[in-house]
Each structure stands twice: as C-alpha cells, then as structure tokens.
Regions:
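Signal-transmission coiled-coil "S-helix"-like helices
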Residues: 1-11
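Metal-dependent catalytic cores of enzymes that make or break cyclic nucleotides
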Residues: 9-11, 18, 25, 29-267
Length: 268
C-alpha cells in the first residue's frame, strides 16, 4: 500500500510540474501576438528531431540514443527554452521596427516646440530682410520665444502627473494644442504594419499639424477575444475599456490625477 501511494504521489507531482511548465509556456506565448504559439510548437519539433536522430542507422547520429530520463529532460528543456522571456519587457518582445522603443514622448513634443522657435526666428530674419524695423522684429522674436518656452514648461509639468489637472489647466492645454507646425515628410514611411493600419488616409504635403494631437494611430482597438461578456461563467462584472491603449497626446496630458488612462488601469 505504501509503495502504491508513493507511486501515486510521484505521478501527481510530475503532473503538477508538467502543468506549471506548460502554464509558463502559455503565459510567454500570450505576452505577444507575434509568437504564434512558438513555445508550444518547439517541443513537438524537438521531439521529431530527437526521434529522427535516435532512428538514424548511419552518419554522425548512428550511435545516438536517448533513455527514458533523457527523453524527459528533452521534453522539459523544450518547454522551458523560452522561460527567460518572462522577465523580458513586452515592448522588446513586440518590437516591430528597429527604432521602436519604450520612451517618453515629451521628447517629440519638445522637438515640435523647437521647430516653432526656429520658424519664428526665420520669420524674424525674413521680416528684417524685407525692410521691417530690426529692433521691433528682434523684440517680437524674444517675446515669442519666451511664450513658447513657458508653454513647453507648462506641458512638461502636466506630463509629470504630480499635480491634479483641473478644468482650467485642461483648457490651457487645448489652447496650446491648437498651435500648428508644418510637416513636410510622410509620417507613413518606416512605421510598423500595425501602426500603418491605424493611421488615417494619406494627406497632401506639406500639412499643418496640431502641436498636441489625438490621432487615429494613437487608438489601439481591443480585440474581441479580450472582452469579458456580461454572462461570463465566472461572474466577473468589469467595465472593459473599448480600447486596448489610448495614446492620444492631449488625452494623456489631460489625465486628472496620476499618469494612467482607464486603459492602463484596466491592464494593471
């Protein structure tokens, strides 16, 4: 009886270990839509290759053989070959283009302010070249630069999420967002296929762009498989956001408290 019970315990322990291994592999596959069940396919391919090596009667594998414990080791190793991806950030696993990276988009916004300052300087020198009073033009340029510097400092402070964003601050954000800058390059070139699908129709260049914008490509739709139906068997009652991500610049800068959108909070 003791022997039978011991065997049963060992078998149950192996089954539990196997379940943990496959759960880990399934979790890694679920981290990215691009792996396509990679962790589940590798064990099958590994067994086919190992079986072919064992069956070889000539060549370099003619003396190759695997015992019962060896097969178990191959099985476990194949299922765990990608376990390191558990600690790999999703933006690395899902990297779709060479320059894609997780970074603070305040750098993009700062560069747009730099463009506006440069445009103001060019306009100043063009006015002077056209006969305008140099002192007045320089004074107007200095005032314009000071305003742009102050507005960027305000946007940057909103980005930090340390203070509550009240309606007055949101109204000012919208006023700043209404500024425009001139884009002369196609923003559909070099982007990932997913981002390209989210973009709106191509526009004729050059085009005036809002300084801060909520664009179609900022809205990442939530797949039907990620929705929890109201009649789910677990009885969960969750408000599932319609979007997987909402990366709109104005939307995120207008977050009332903290740094997270509703979509971010749901994901956490």
């Amino acid at each position: 009886a003791v022997s039978v019970e011991t065997r049963a315990l060992i078998r149950a322990q192996k089954q539990l270990f196997e379940s943990f291994i496959q759960l880990l592999a399934d979790a890694i596959d679920a981290k990215s839509p691009y792996t396509g069940g990679h962790c589940a396919r590798v064990p099958e391919l590994t067994k086919l290759l190992a079986g072919a090596a064992c069956a070889a009667t000539d060549g370099p594998f003619r003396d190759f053989t695997l015992g019962e414990e060896d097969w178990e080791a191959v099985h476990i190793a194949a299922w765990l070959h990608d376990c390191g991806k558990v600690t790999t950030p999703e933006y690395i696993v899902d990297k779709a283009t060479k320059l894609e990276v997780l970074y603070d988009r305040i750098h993009e916004i700062r560069m747009r302010f730099e463009v506006l300052k440069r445009d103001a300087e060019i306009a100043c020198w063009q006015a002077i070249a056209g006969g305008a009073d140099e002192a007045a033009a320089r004074a107007a340029l200095a005032a314009g630069w000071a305003l742009l510097d102050e507005e960027f400092a305000f946007v940057a402070a909103c980005n930090e999420g340390g203070e509550e964003i009240d309606p007055a601050r949101i109204e000012r954000l919208q006023q700043i967002a209404a500024r425009t800058w001139l884009r002369t390059l196609d923003d559909r070139l070099g982007v990932s296929p997913d981002e390209l699908r989210r973009k709106g129709p191509a526009v004729a260049l050059p085009v005036l762009e809002a300084l801060l914008a909520d664009k179609p490509e900022h809205r990442v739709a939530r797949g039907a498989d990620e929705l929890i139906p109201a009649d789910n068997p677990w009885g969960f009652r969750l408000q599932v956001p319609a979007l997987l991500y909402n990366r709109g610049e104005l939307t995120n800068l207008s977050i009332g408290r903290g740094t997270l959108t509703d979509e971010d909070r749901y994901k956490i």
